[in-house]
Amino acid sequence: MINKEFNKLIKEDAGYREDCSLCKESKLMVGQKTPYGAIIICKGSDQKNGWFATLSPKTGGNIKKDFTIQIMPIPHINHISELGSNEELAKNYGLAFSQAGKAITKIMREENRHLENEEKVVRIGMYGKSKHPEEHLHIKLFPWEHPYVVDSTYENKEIQVDEEENEFVKMTPVKKAIIDEKRFNYLAEKLINILK
């Protein structure tokens, strides 16, 4: 049963889905804005094996310094494991991911963000998600100071216990805010030029 379900997952139809917002975004050209307000900052030309990236108009971090790049496959892939059955798509994921990381690093170094931590390094966080089985895979990269839950950060926090004996740690809520239009446009133009 488990193998049957897994085989079904990795052999799903990755074709364009009219009801998927990310499939629709994959048809846009570099520099165009999505209905959400993100800007397409790079795009591969291969519809079967390509990836595209957007700059989000919102951040969960400091709106004066932080930003989020989201990379997505052009085909409608639901789960990262599906890349194992398409070697070219997997290779192009590696290229898209590393290029996005390079672009973030370049901007952070130019803005001296590496001087904000004791190691004097550029810190980049990332995560990928699919909230339900039909959702288009998307992976986000962002400056590390952006709020993000990591094991090593939270294992040293004071553990609280609620009335039902459930353990938890206190944390500040992450609230997305819109990046100033001037900075957003600057970042979009800069990222497009870096990712050419």
PLM features: what roles do these ranges have?
Residues 1-196:
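HIT superfamily nucleotide-processing domains
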